[in-house]
């Protein structure tokens, strides 16, 4: 359906009204245009002009409809903005305004007035409100401006109309597409269903059609059209086929319509012509063919196709001259299909009429739209009436033909056949007979076959009907499911669309929100970055201010105490020149004004002003320190110095002292070295200025004696004898007591240690009333440990100490520890820290020491870290660039408070120290244990060390894990010791009631018995011929049948070769095997006995049996050579003999027996059995032969001059290859070989022992010290051991024994317990079995030997297991050592 027709037929009332208004206005414009354009000079209208105007307006209307396809809405007027027309005479354009039409003088006055009113209203809307418009007065307005204004107004209105029309078109287009889709879907379902039903009809009717008619009808089928457009007779339909099936189209025969049915109206004639199948679309043309009732070509073709063909008749021979009778066409019994054809024609007519109606509506635009609809309904009613009339005419025609046929049937048939009536009757009779015969034959033969065929056809039809019903039900169900699914799909799609729309807007909102947040964040980041830059700049200036203040403070102090001069050659040359140039100019600033750090404007003040304020703060801080010391001293009356001869010396004022040089105090009973005397001067100046300090000389340079000397200086110069407090580690308490007593005997030392009761007694000697002690005070110096001072801090805080010395000050390196806080709260005038390693792990430790001595200057660790710590620590760890200027400033700050000298600069006579790293490999057992531990963790050794170093005390699992790795590297026996292996003993052991009842020698011979026992009957033992005790029958039988009896022997010459007589052979044969072996063992020959006797007794020995001889007893003269070879044979081969007895026979058994047991016990009641057992087990000859001969027995035999050959046999039991017992102790050789470190240390100790060195060996684990003690016992090395469990008294004794007894080869020490405060210069070799986390602890430990008094070169060996965690620990220790070298190594 065309869109224009839809618009013309379906618009609402408002649209129709607007169309009417538009049409009227257009006609009015046409009339006006005609009036203007077609009036010539004579006042007549030109017809051509009228036609032209009409055609122009009509074409414009059609073009506007085609472009917009819509009618303007109500209230708008379709007008031409500017209409240009020409007259026939002058052809001048005339502008006609839609607001005010161009009219002539004869126009209607009412129209002119209305137009004037409209014009006035428009002008009134334009003019201002103040302007009063008078209707009676027509203002003068420019016509050109007015026409342009009116045209613009019309263009705007027209654009609004076009926009609204376009919107309506879009809505109609959407509805059209939707309806078309619905029609297509519905038509598809209907077409499928009709095709299936028609196919079933075709298959059922094929069985009823004759062969002739079947072929004709099949030929007549039009296969180019759908199946339902043909007749129901067609091709057979195969079920399940997807091809299209067409039906033959049968057009209905219809009588021509009567002339009276035609109307005079042009529209009715067009509808009738369309219904009759004409193709004439003109409304004005006549329909003569339809009116006269003539057939159209389609109707003629239909009539010709509906005539039956002439049947073939069987007739007799006739004359050729006669004509054939008329043959009537045979009618088909099938009813005609009229309704279907009528519906098709009606549909075609409807389409044509609708098309013509649209055209008419376009042409007759001036008519009312309602009238068009009424005419369409009338046309439809007329068409329906014409169709009914045509059906009635066809039925009447058929009845008339039926009535005429019986009347003229016979004559027409006979005449048609060319026969007479008689002949025709005969022919018909013959024909009937033949026809009957045929039918009889058919009924007899073909009847049953036909019946069967009908049954089969019926059955097949029923089957097809069932299939059709099933398919129809299935199709209906499918259609229903599809409709249901479509409905569900619509709901689902609607929900999905809603969800997607919701997600879209939500995502859109989120995106907008994110963009907004991003923009805001960018603004905030920008502002934050600018603020950070300003704050960083401000903090930089603030830090520079603080550093400058500290520099100036250090500079002012350094000028007073002259640290550079005291350091000597160890000073930094770069600092000397730079210091005086830029800091001396601030020496004269006024220190009375103090500037608060929070009140300083770092953003606006210049650098010079900030430096001057920093100088003022530094000067003020120095004055405060001096005033504090002065206040401490003035709290009690000042003492007079006896050496000043009555002149008062106010030592509280350091400015009065001037630059003095302090000599060595006379009270000090030793001679200070040059660098030590400089240290004394530095300490004395610090005290006089009221400033605390750090004496950081390298270990072994005498920090103890320097600190004792400053105490002696105060006592001797200012009569200040205390109270002095010395806090030291527990291992050096006795050392301090001995050193003070030794160097200053006049000092009374109070050793404050022991249990709580002892310390309570010692506190009675404290004099809390006196601020300063004199020479007669109960004590002068109190020596205690860090642990005890923390425990009794409440008592120490009540005292005011003149001087406090902290030895090994790295013990207070943690500013968060209770030890550091307790010592900081003590009241004392001056503090002195002694440490050889001010930095051990990080810069935080250095800050803790600096804050302890100067809390007012070094008050913030964060600031100190920002100044120096981050840069220096990052350089040491990752080798980054280092700011040399920053490092110089740090050295300048530390110089006044810290004095540090190293050994190579101040002690030339001290021997060198050589450090050697000895790398060891893991053994097989160690590798397995190490791999097992590594498999249980997923981090590397480096990461493990990072976590362990950063972990707190609560993270004990990491420290434990690292300790397990280190235990594997030391020795695998730290996990599991080797057990003693012994077999299972299957027997009974003897028991005793009490050892007190036994004698000194407890005889336990044969005390172990086997659990298995058996009884031997007495008769069997006595009556059987067994070797038993005193049996005459056995002897007689043996004597008769023994081959060793001389009576039974004939050939005895072979006995001379073995030096045995026949009687001796008989004697040996009667002995048991053990007695025989003892008898034959070492039987000397005559020559050997003679030579042995002569050599041992030098010819003086004469046996008793030789004294009865008349002749002298003489020896052989040719025995010198024999004596050398026989007598000294054992002495010459003594080395080989010892090797065979001690080493070759000591083999490690490959297999240890699982169980062992004594012989099975035999019980017998025979006396012979008992005697035999006693003789065997307790034979004195056998026992004396197996065990060595006692010295007393041998001496008695010599005195009785018994011949050697008559000496009882002894010590004949040979050395076993294995031990006598199956109990296996762990092998010490294997114990050494299972540890790579211990095996390497064993080789090293052998060389050191051979070279005469004395060794200090440091361990980290006490269990490893116990294992090493077993090794030393096995090697028979002499040693002593010192660890944390050693008491203070034992420490002193051990150190003294080591220094005085050179036979002690090894001194075993724990690194933490024995690495501090000990003087062990007797050792020249130091070995670290395992290294400490802190490199300074190892440095202090090795300096126990490398210190003053050492004259030999000291070698330090460090055992490190390769490719293990120990190597990582050593690398980390070197990083920490690098930090110390950077900060204090070059000061």
From Swiss-Prot:
User: What EC number(s) has UniProt assigned to this enzyme?
Assistant: 3.6.4.-
Q: Which reaction does it catalyse?
A: ATP + H2O = ADP + phosphate + H(+)
**Which enzyme type, at the first EC level?**
hydrolase
The UniProt regions of compositional bias labelled Polar residues, in chain numbering, are 1-24, 90-113
> Which SMART domains does this one have?
DEXDc, HELICc
- PROSITE patterns according to UniProt: DBINO, HELICASE_ATP_BIND_1, HELICASE_CTER
Positions of the Helicase C-terminal domain: 1240-1387
Q: Pfam families under this entry?
A: DBINO (PF13892), Helicase_C (PF00271), SNF2-rel_dom (PF00176)
Which residues hold ATP? 697-704
Where does it reside?
Nucleus
List where Basic and acidic residues composition bias occurs.
360-382
Q: Which spans of this chain does the record mark as coiled coil?
A: 480-551
- Where does this chain carry the motif DEAQ box? 807-810
Q: Which residues form the Helicase ATP-binding domain?
A: 684-856
Q: Which UniProt keywords apply?
A: Activator, ATP-binding, Coiled coil, DNA damage, DNA repair, DNA-binding, Hydrolase, Nucleotide-binding, Nucleus, Transcription, Transcription regulation
Biased composition of type Basic residues is found at 241-257
Task: Give the InterPro entries listed for this entry.
Answer: DBINO, Helicase_ATP-bd, Helicase_C-like, INO80/SWR1_helicase, P-loop_NTPase, SNF2-like_sf, SNF2/RAD54-like_C, SNF2_N
- Low complexity bias: where? 283-295
Q: Which family does it belong to?
A: Belongs to the SNF2/RAD54 helicase family.
Task: Describe its function.
Answer: ATPase component of the INO80 complex which remodels chromatin by shifting nucleosomes and is involved in DNA repair.
Q: Tell what the record comments on domains.
A: The DBINO region is involved in binding to DNA.
Subunit description: Component of the INO80 chromatin-remodeling complex.
- State the protein's name: Chromatin-remodeling ATPase INO80
Q: Which gene encodes it?
A: INO80
């Amino acid at each position: 359906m065309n869109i224009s027709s839809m618009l013309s037929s379906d618009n609402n009332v408002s649209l129709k009204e607007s169309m009417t208004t538009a049409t009227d206005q257009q006609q009015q414009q046409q009339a006006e245009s005609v009036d203007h354009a077609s009036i010539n000079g004579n006042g007549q209208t030109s017809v051509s002009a009228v036609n032209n105007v009409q055609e122009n307006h009509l074409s414009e209307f059609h073009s506007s409809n085609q472009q917009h396809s819509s009618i303007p809405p109500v209230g708008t007027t379709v007008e031409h903005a500017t209409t240009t027309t020409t007259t026939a005479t002058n052809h001048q354009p005339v502008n006609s305004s839609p607001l005010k039409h161009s009219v002539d003088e004869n126009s209607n006055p009412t129209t002119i007035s209305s137009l004037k009113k409209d014009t006035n209203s428009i002008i009134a809307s334009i003019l201002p409100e103040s302007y009063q418009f008078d209707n009676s007065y027509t203002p003068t307005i420019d016509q050109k401006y007015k026409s342009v204004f009116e045209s613009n107004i019309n263009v705007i209105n027209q654009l609004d109309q076009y926009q609204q029309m376009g919107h309506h078109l879009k809505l109609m287009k959407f509805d059209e597409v939707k309806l078309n889709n619905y029609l297509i879907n519905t038509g598809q379902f209907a077409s499928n269903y009709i095709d299936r039903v028609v196919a079933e009809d075709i298959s059922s009717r094929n069985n009823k059609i004759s062969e002739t008619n079947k072929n004709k009808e099949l030929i007549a089928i039009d296969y180019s059209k759908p199946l339902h457009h043909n007749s129901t007779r067609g091709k057979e339909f195969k079920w399940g086929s997807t091809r299209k099936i067409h039906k033959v189209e049968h057009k209905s025969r219809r009588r021509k319509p009567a002339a009276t049915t035609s109307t005079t109206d042009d529209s009715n004639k067009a509808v009738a012509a369309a219904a009759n199948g004409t193709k004439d679309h003109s409304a004005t043309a006549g329909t003569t063919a339809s009116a006269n009732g003539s057939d159209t070509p389609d109707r003629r073709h239909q009539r010709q196709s509906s005539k039956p063909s002439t049947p073939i008749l069987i007739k007799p021979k006739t004359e050729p001259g006669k004509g054939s009778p008329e043959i009537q066409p045979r009618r088909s019994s099938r009813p005609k299909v009229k309704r279907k054809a009528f519906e098709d024609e009606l549909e075609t007519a409807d389409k044509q009429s609708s098309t013509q109606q649209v055209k008419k509506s376009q042409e007759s635009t001036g008519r009312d739209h309602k009238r068009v609809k009424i005419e369409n309904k009338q046309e439809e009613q007329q068409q329906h009436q014409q169709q009914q009339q045509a059906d009635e005419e066809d039925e009447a025609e058929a009845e008339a033909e039926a009535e005429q046929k019986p009347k003229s049937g016979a004559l027409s048939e006979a005449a048609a056949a060319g026969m007479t009536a008689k002949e025709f009757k005969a022919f018909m009779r013959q024909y009937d007979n033949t026809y009957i015969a045929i039918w009889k034959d058919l009924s007899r033969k073909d009847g049953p076959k036909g019946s069967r065929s009908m049954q089969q056809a019926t059955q097949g039809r029923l089957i097809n009907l069932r299939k059709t019903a099933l398919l129809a039900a299935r199709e209906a169900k499918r259609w229903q499911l599809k409709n249901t699914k479509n409905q569900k799909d619509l709901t689902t799609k609607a929900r999905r669309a809603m969800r997607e729309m919701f997600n879209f807007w939500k995502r859109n909102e989120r995106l907008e929100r994110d963009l907004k947040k991003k923009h805001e964040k960018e603004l905030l980041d920008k502002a934050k970055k600018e603020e950070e830059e300003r704050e960083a700049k401000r903090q930089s200036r603030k830090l520079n201010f603080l550093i400058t203040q500290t520099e100036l403070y250090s500079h002012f102090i350094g000028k007073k105490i002259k640290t550079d001069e005291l350091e000597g050659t160890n000073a930094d040359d770069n600092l000397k020149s730079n210091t005086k140039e830029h800091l001396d100019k601030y020496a004269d600033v006024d220190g009375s004004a103090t500037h608060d750090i929070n009140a300083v404007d770092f953003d606006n003040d210049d650098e010079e002003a900030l430096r001057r304020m920093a100088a003022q703060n530094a000067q003020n801080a120095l004055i405060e320190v001096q005033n504090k010391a002065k206040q401490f001293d003035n709290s009690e009356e000042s003492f007079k110095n006896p050496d000043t001869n009555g002149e008062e010396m106010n030592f509280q004022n350091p400015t009065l002292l001037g630059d003095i040089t302090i000599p060595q105090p006379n009270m000090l009973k030793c001679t200070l070295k040059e660098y030590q005397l400089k240290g004394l001067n530095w300490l004395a100046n610090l005290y006089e200025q009221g400033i605390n300090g750090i004496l950081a000389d390298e270990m072994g340079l005498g920090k103890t004696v320097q600190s004792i000397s400053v105490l002696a200086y105060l006592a001797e110069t200012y009569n200040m004898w205390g109270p002095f407090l010395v806090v030291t580690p527990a291992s050096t308490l006795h050392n301090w007591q001995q050193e003070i007593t030794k160097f200053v005997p006049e000092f009374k030392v109070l050793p404050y240690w022991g249990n709580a009761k002892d310390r309570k007694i010692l506190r009675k000697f404290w004099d809390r009333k006196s601020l300063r002690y004199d020479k007669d005070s109960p004590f002068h110096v109190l020596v205690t440990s860090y642990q005890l001072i923390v425990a009794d801090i409440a008592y120490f805080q009540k005292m005011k100490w003149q001087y406090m010395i902290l030895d090994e000050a790295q013990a207070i390196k943690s500013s968060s520890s209770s030890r550091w806080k307790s010592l900081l709260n003590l009241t004392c005038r001056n503090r002195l820290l002694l440490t050889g390693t001010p930095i051990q792990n990080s810069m935080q430790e250095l800050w803790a020491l600096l804050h302890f001595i100067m809390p007012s200057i070094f008050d913030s660790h964060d600031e100190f870290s920002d100044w120096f710590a981050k840069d220096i620590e990052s350089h040491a760890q990752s080798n980054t660039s280092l700011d040399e200027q920053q490092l110089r400033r740090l050295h300048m700050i530390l110089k006044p408070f810290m004095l540090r000298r190293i050994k190579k600069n101040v002690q030339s006579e001290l021997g060198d120290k050589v450090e050697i790293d000895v790398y060891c490999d893991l053994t097989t057992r160690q590798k397995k244990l190490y791999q097992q531990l590594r498999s249980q963790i997923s981090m590397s050794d480096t990461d493990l060390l990072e976590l362990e170093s950063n972990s707190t005390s609560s993270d004990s699992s990491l420290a434990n894990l690292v300790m397990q790795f280190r235990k594997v590297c030391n020795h695998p026996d730290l996990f599991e010791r080797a057990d003693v292996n012994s077999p299972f003993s299957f027997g009974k052991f003897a028991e005793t009631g009490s050892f007190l009842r036994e004698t000194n020698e407890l005889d336990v011979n044969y005390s172990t018995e086997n659990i298995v026992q058996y009884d031997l009957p007495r008769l069997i033992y006595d009556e059987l011929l067994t070797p038993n005790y005193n049996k005459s029958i056995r002897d007689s039988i043996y004597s008769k049948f023994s081959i060793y009896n001389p009576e039974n022997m004939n050939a005895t010459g072979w006995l001379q070769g073995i030096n045995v007589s026949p009687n001796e052979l008989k004697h040996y044969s009667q002995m048991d095997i053990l007695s025989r072996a003892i008898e034959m063992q070492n039987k000397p020959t005559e020559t050997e006995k003679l030579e042995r006797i002569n050599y041992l007794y030098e010819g003086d020995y004469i046996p008793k049996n030789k004294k009865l001889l008349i002749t002298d007893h003489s020896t052989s003269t040719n025995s010198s050579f024999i004596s050398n070879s026989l007598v000294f044979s054992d002495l010459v081969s003594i080395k080989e003999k010892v090797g065979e007895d001690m080493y070759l026979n000591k083999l490690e058994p490959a297999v240890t027996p699982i169980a062992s047991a004594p012989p099975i016990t035999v019980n017998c009641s025979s006396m012979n059995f008992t005697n035999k057992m006693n003789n065997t087990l307790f034979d004195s000859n056998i026992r004396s032969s197996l065990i060595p001969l006692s010295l007393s027995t041998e001496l008695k035999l010599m005195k009785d001059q018994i011949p050697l050959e008559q000496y009882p046999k002894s010590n004949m039991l040979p050395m076993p290859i294995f031990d006598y017992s199956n109990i296996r102790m762990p092998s010490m050789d294997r114990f050494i070989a299972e540890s790579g470190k211990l095996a390497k240390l064993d080789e090293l100790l052998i060389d050191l022992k051979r070279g005469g060195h004395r060794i200090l060996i440091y361990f980290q684990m006490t269990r490893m010290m116990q294992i090493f003690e077993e090794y030393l016992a096995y090697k028979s090395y002499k040693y002593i051991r010192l660890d944390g469990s050693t008491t203070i008294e034992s420490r002193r004794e051990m150190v003294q024994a080591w220094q005085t007894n050179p036979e002690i080869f090894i001194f075993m020490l724990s690194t933490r317990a024995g690495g501090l405060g000990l003087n062990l210069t007797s050792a020249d070799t130091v070995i670290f079995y395992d290294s400490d986390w802190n490199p300074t602890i190892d440095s202090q430990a090795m300096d126990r030997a490398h210190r003053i008094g050492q004259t030999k070169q000291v070698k330090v060996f460090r055992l490190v297991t390769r490719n293990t965690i120990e190597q990582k620990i050593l690398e980390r220790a070197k990083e920490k050592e690098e930090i110390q070298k950077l900060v204090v190594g070059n000061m």
